[in-house]
Structures are given as structure tokens and as C-alpha cells.
Amino acid sequence: MRYAALFYHRIWHIRSRVIARRIIQIMKNISFVVVVLLVAVGLAAAEIKNKGWWRNAVFYQVYPRSFMDSNGDGIGDLKGITSRLQHFNSTGVTAIWLSPINKSPMNDFGYDISNFTDIAPVFGTLKDIDDLLKEAHKIGLKVILDLVPNHTSDEHPWFEKSVKKEGNYTDYYIWVNGIGKDKKSPPNNWVSVFNGSAWTYHETRKQFYFHQFLKSQPDLNYRNPVVQEEMKNIMKFWLDKGIDGFRIDAVPHLYELKDITKNEPKLDHVDPSLNASNHAYYNHIYTKDQNETYELVQSWRNFVDDYAKQNNRDEIVLLTEAYTSLSNTIKYYNYGSHVPFNFKFITDADANSNVSQLKNVIDSWINEMPQGTAANWVMGNHDRVRLGSRYPGRADQMIMLEMILPGVAVTYYGEEIGMVDIPYMKYDVRDGCRSPFQWDNTTSAGFSKNKTTWLPVNDNYKEINLQKESNQKNSTYQLYTKLIELRKRHTLKHGSLITKELSKYVLAVLRETESETVSLLINTSQNRASVNLTELGSTRVSEKPTKIQLGSTNFDKEPGISVNNSIIELPGQAAVILISSGASLTSYSVISLLFAVLFSLFPW
């Protein structure tokens, strides 16, 4: 019995060891699986979602002061915007971009910020922006915030502390000693964008501070790394709230030459009416477009990308405003900007431009932009004469052009209903393009219950308003919404682009894939024009079934009608979009089509 007991004890001991080893192995396997799952979850969390959502987007600029007044004070506000979110949903825009809403003394209508992380009381509260974001995201609408990094208000606590040389704030701005016997003369001839010296002497600090814009807008010193971190903290504050991206203001002015002893040279050809105090008098080689500016923008791109990865967010988009040369603007593509604003239809073209000039505006941008990037087209903004006033009678065709071209389209509020500038307001004060949105034909065009608004409502509001155009079969608003719907077609997302000068007055724009051609014909003259479709160089358009898809409000044929005999008549200042289906391709290079498809599938 003793030996039997020992035998069974030994057997039990061996089995226990085997079971223990198996348990240990199972635990190891479980641990391995847990580790793999944790790594997988970690990788999933460290991922930018929905990359490229912006590549074919329509961004809509909201000027908050003029969009919708919720409390009857005559000034638009955040609650007003929230109350009108359905408008964006109905039109189909991808994102709204809010002009500055930060706390500000309003010397430059919000572009002079005294607190980057608070809301100007005239627009509402932080809760109001939280509510706006919540409701916008419910309907799939993204919200872009204006970021003004070049300068602050002189009422910002940073500047007040810098004046007193308090700690790190001493060098938050660009301070220099004056020259001359009394040390009260500016150190050089640099002038402000708003004319006059860009240097202002501060009696308390006994030094000059630099300002590219108003003297109440001192420039920040980005050669101070603490200032760079401050701006990233501000970006994080808004990203934490759910902002989907930033439109970065006045980017070319972020840096100036470090050597302040150099004077800027006079331009070779200067308007005789200008003098040395005018900004347009000089070639701004020291106060604009410095290499460090591009590096700073790249650092912001790295920051938002890292934030999106760490928070498993959709790609955070950066749009940059730069009034500069084509080459300097295009360069931002290589330094982190998703959308370096293309202002060429504003700065390089107007109602007097011929077809060759319009074609060049398009081709020059397309030919210069890096492969794999997205083009963009801006027709108007809060600083320029409205599209409908710059191109009288032709606003429809310019919107059609913008929407047919590849890439991003940017709409300034009111363009979708054909708003124009208030005629009696001088264009150089910028107010003509900032009048209240025209919602209907009631008091103050439905913008406010108050008969007195911060700017007067345009007298034409009973004829041009959203309510009226929504109920009309043929209106600018109906055209606008149909164009946004049309942009969803594969051809307009991924098709190649061809521009053709059919005559001095007729421009053709073709978008094409292997199975479809979308053609836009624009008649810039006031006279009727006859267009032979064989001139487009497309056997598909001239031989395959071609139908009218959309026409400008002054086009005289109904959508859906087939084009017979390859001839189409365009009324004066009219435009039409045609769609042709079939296997034939245009005479453009098949290799170009192949590259277009590849870049659409594998964007850089």
C-alpha cells in the first residue's frame, strides 16, 4: 500500500506539473493576444481618419457679423449661425469657415485679437461655439476657424506685459531701438500694409514695435520659441473643442528680415500718384515671403497631423491665405498647407479679361501645383468686391467655372444667391461686400428683427433673397445647389482637365474619364455665340449622345435636351454644361488620363 500511495502521489505530481505548464502556456497565449489587441487598438488610435475629405470640398466662408442676428442688436452672432445650419445642409457645402470670432476691441473687425481662447461678446460665448459645433457635426458639416497668428491686439495681455518687459513676455513682440539723436526715428523704411510706417514708438518701453497692419496690431516674434508654443496651445484649445481645421490669416507676413538696418527697395514701376508712405511703393523683399515662414507653416501641419493621429480624428485641414506671387503661393503645398488659397480669379482677372486671360489663370495654377495635390479656386472674400459686382451679369458662369474645375471650391457668403456690393459704398473700405445676408423680403432681409443693422441691407433684397430663389425653378441658388450635386460625379472628382480658347469670347473647359466627358462652355460677350462641338477636339462630344445638364439662369434651353448637329447656341453672357457618354476619348494624351487616375487613387 505504501508503494501504491507513493506511485499515485508521483503520478499526481507529474500531472500537476503538466497541467501547470499548460496553464502557464495558455496564460502566455492570452497575454500575447492581449498585447496584440492592445497594439492594434493603439495603432488604430494613432491614425488619421478620413484622409483627403477636403480634396473635392466646397468651403463656405461665413462672415459672422453679417450672417444672422439672433438677438435683435443688428449684428450677426454664433446663435444666428447655428439657427441657419440647415441652409448649409440644403446647399450641400462640405464645411463652413468662420471669420474671426475671438475676443477683440474690433479695430479691424476681429483681426485684432485680445484673447485667442475666448469669444467676442458681440458674437456670443464659448458655449455658443460648442453648441454650433455639436449641431454642425450632427449633420455632417465641418467647421473651420480663422486663425490670426501674425499679430495680436495691443490690448492683449501679452503685449501689455511685453511693454513692461515682464519675464518671457519681453520678447513676445518685435521691439527695436530708434535711430537719430533722440532715438525716436524708425530704424528703416518698412511700411504697413495699411500705409504709413510699420514702426510705432511706445513711450513706456522707449522702443519701437513692428506692425505689418494697424498700429493696434503688433506683430508677434516667431523667432521666440515660446511664442511658437503659445500658438500651438491655442490651436490645441480649439481642436479639443472639435474644430475641424484652420484658415490661417496673412501668412506671408509672419517673419521679417532679422537685419533691420536694410531698407526695402522701390518698385521699378510705381504709380505716379503713390509716395514713400504707400505699401504699393516698395518691393517687399524683407517683410514678406521669408523662408522661415514656410518652415513655421510646416511645423503647424506636423502639429495638427500629430493631434489627429493621437486623437483618432479626421484629417485636420489647413488653409493658408497668401497674397503673393504664384510661385510663392504654390510653395506652401510643399510646406504643409492642404489648401494654399488661389486668388488668381480675384487678382488676375475681371470682367474685362478675355478668354485667353481666363484660360491662363486656370492653366498657370494647374501647371505649377505639385503632383498629387488638390487645386482650389476662390472667387470672393470679405476683403474684395463681390463676384457679382466684379463680373456683372456673369456671376452664374463664374460659379459654374469654379464648380467644374478640379479640386476645392470656396464660396463667400451670398454668392450662392447672387448678392452684389452695396453700390454707394466705396470699394476701398471693404464694407460693400460685407452687407447682411439676404434671407427673405421681410425686415432687414430676414437677417435681423432690428430695422437698423450694423451695415445697411442692400436695397435689392426684395429681388435677391434666399427664400425667393429657393422657390424659383431658374435661379442662381437653384443652379448653385445643382452644381454641388454635380460635383459628386466621378468625372468631376477624378477626370482630367482640358481648357480651350474656342474664340476670343468663348471658353471651353472639359473634364473627362474613360466613360464620360463633362463640358462647360462660357460666352463672355454680350452677343450670341454659335459653338461647333467638333472644335472641342472630342469625338465623344461630337459623335456620342450629348445632353444639356445645366445652364446659367440666362441660358434658353431646358436641361436634358439632346444637342443635335453638333451645334449649340449660347446667349450673351451665358454658360452651359454638357454631358457626353461613350467609349471614345478626346485627342488629349491617354497617358495624361492614366496619371490622373493614378493620382486620384494614390494621393501624395
Where are the regions that the model predicts?
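Acidic/aromatic-lined carbohydrate-recognition and catalytic surfaces
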Residues: A46-K236, D240, H253-Y323, F437
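C-terminal beta-strand-rich structural cap/linker in extracellular carbohydrate-active enzymes
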Residues: E558-S581
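Substrate-binding cleft/loops of secretory-pathway carbohydrate-active enzymes
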Residues: S153-V163, K309-N312, V317-A351, V420-V429
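Cleavable N-terminal signal peptides of Sec/SRP-targeted secreted and luminal proteins
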Residues: N29-A46, S589-P603
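Loop/helix patches that line or flank the sugar-binding groove of alpha-linked glycan CAZymes
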Residues: D259, E264-Y286, E295-E315, Y332-N334, ...
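C-terminal GPI-anchoring signal of eukaryotic secretory precursors
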Residues: S580-I591
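Beta-strand-rich binding/interaction modules
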Residues: R528-N554
